[in-house]
């Protein structure tokens, strides 16, 4: 059976034509599946009965199975999604007064082996399918539906409640979950196309961000195919240190990466690149390195996002103390570089940045099923 979640509009047009249907049927399917979240063809009332029968014989709408659901004290919510054979990936929803951000995974594990990342320690299993990527957004909108009044400030909630197109709680998507998005290029781009489609999720390119550790050729392809907002995991101002923290730097050093960023900017929906910099105590948080970083990025329109490290067992790293982070930020700000310190969210449920390990083989053997049919961890 063909999973319709694997298709963007172009793919659905081809699928419909193969069944002898007109191209406009693809738009109808997109709206039923993604905007209205329907999985049963019998409910798609504006489709001809003969077409619905064909669909029931050949296709399914099958999002990945949810195996656990956790909510942190700050409202951050994390779900584990089964990918079969005891593996799982994670998606995280971060509510804020004026927006709701979904952090999406693109791979089971990651091959890039960044030394400070728990997912990198897991190793690489496989790429996620389009259905498994877009299924995260599909699920989030379904599971959070009706909670707009609780998730947003009163004025924003009222505006969104009055507009059918903005009732969905996810306003922003960041490809910052498990995996390197650009290492799963085709599936990620197809999923991005669905996120941006007015017939599916209708997000603007400014509200969708792809984060990369620096796969330069794929970054150039993204610029040509689907230039959404870009975040680059930099983490060091020189190759010697970045080689240790982000091993892909040995293949695509900082000079090549920054050149790719400059090429990306003319097509980007924002007039800057975001550079991410995890703050590791006594590793990359000195004033000298801050000054070196200023020299490295000063000619690129950018923002710096300093990320306090979230420790995990066996990491070998510690979070920089508050004074070190503040002093590092001040050096950048004094040089005219817009710099923010990321607020740690969801760390009490291991949902914070860098903690998405997804090692749940023991949990998948201990799942039960709730009344809605979704599996939940029982122990």
From Swiss-Prot:
Keywords: 4Fe-4S, Cytoplasm, Disulfide bond, Iron, Iron-sulfur, Metal-binding, Methyltransferase, rRNA processing, S-adenosyl-L-methionine, Transferase, tRNA processing
Compartmental location: Cytoplasm
PANTHER family attached to this UniProt entry: 23S RRNA METHYLTRANSFERASE, RADICAL SAM CORE DOMAIN-CONTAINING PROTEIN
Keyword S-adenosyl-L-methionine belongs to the record: yes
Disulfide feature: 103-353
Pfam families found in the cross-reference section: Radical_SAM, RlmN_N
Cofactor note: Binds 1 [4Fe-4S] cluster. The cluster is coordinated with 3 cysteines and an exchangeable S-adenosyl-L-methionine.
Name of the protein this chain belongs to: Dual-specificity RNA methyltransferase RlmN
Additional notes on this entry: Reaction proceeds by a ping-pong mechanism involving intermediate methylation of a conserved cysteine residue.
Domain Radical SAM core: 96-348
InterPro entries, sorted: Aldolase_TIM, Methyltransferase_A, RlmN_N, RNA_MTrfase_RlmN, rRNA_lsu_MTrfase_RlmN/Cfr, rSAM
Taxonomic path: Bacteria, Pseudomonadati, Pseudomonadota, Betaproteobacteria, Nitrosomonadales
Species of provenance: Nitrosomonas eutropha (strain DSM 101675 / C91 / Nm57)
Nucleotidyltransferase in keyword set: no
GO molecular function, one term: rRNA binding
């Amino acid at each position: 059976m063909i999973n319709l979640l694997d298709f963007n509009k172009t793919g659905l047009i081809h699928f419909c034509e193969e069944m002898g249907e007109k191209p406009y049927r693809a738009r109808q399917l997109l709206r039923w599946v993604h905007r209205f979240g329907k999985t049963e063809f019998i409910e798609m009332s504006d489709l001809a009965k003969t077409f619905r029968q064909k669909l029931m014989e050949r296709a399914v709408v099958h999002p990945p199975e949810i195996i656990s659901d956790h909510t942190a004290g700050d409202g951050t919510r994390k779900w584990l999604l089964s990918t079969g054979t005891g593996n799982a990936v994670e998606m995280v929803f971060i509510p804020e007064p004026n927006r709701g951000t979904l952090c999406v995974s693109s791979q089971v594990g990651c091959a890039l082996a960044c030394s400070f990342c728990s997912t990198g320690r897991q190793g690489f299993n496989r790429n996620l399918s389009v259905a498994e990527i877009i299924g995260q957004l599909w699920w989030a909108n379904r599971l959070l539906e009706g909670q707009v009044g609780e998730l947003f400030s009163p004025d924003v909630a009222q505006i969104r409640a009055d507009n059918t197109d903005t009732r969905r709680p996810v306003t922003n998507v960041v490809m910052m979950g498990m995996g390197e998005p650009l290492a799963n290029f085709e599936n990620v781009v197809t999923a991005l196309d669905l996120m941006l489609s007015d017939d599916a999720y209708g997000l603007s390119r400014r509200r969708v961000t792809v984060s990369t550790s620096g796969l330069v050729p794929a970054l150039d392809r993204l610029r040509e195919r689907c230039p959404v907002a870009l975040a680059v995991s930099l983490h060091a101002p020189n190759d010697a240190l970045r080689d240790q923290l982000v091993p892909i730097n040995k293949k695509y050093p900082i000079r090549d990466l920054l050149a790719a960023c400059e090429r990306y900017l003319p097509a980007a929906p924002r007039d800057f690149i975001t550079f991410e910099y995890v703050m590791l105590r006594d590793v990359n948080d000195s004033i000298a390195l801050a000054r070196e970083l200023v020299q490295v990025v000063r000619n690129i329109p950018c923002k710096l996002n300093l990320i306090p490290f979230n420790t995990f067992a066996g990491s070998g790293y510690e979070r920089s103390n508050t004074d070190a982070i503040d002093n590092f930020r001040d050096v950048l700000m004094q040089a005219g570089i817009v710099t923010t310190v990321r607020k740690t969210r969801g760390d009490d449920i291991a949902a914070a940045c860098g903690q998405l390990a997804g090692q749940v083989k023991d949990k998948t053997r201990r799942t039960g099923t709730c009344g809605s049919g979704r599996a939940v961890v029982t122990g």
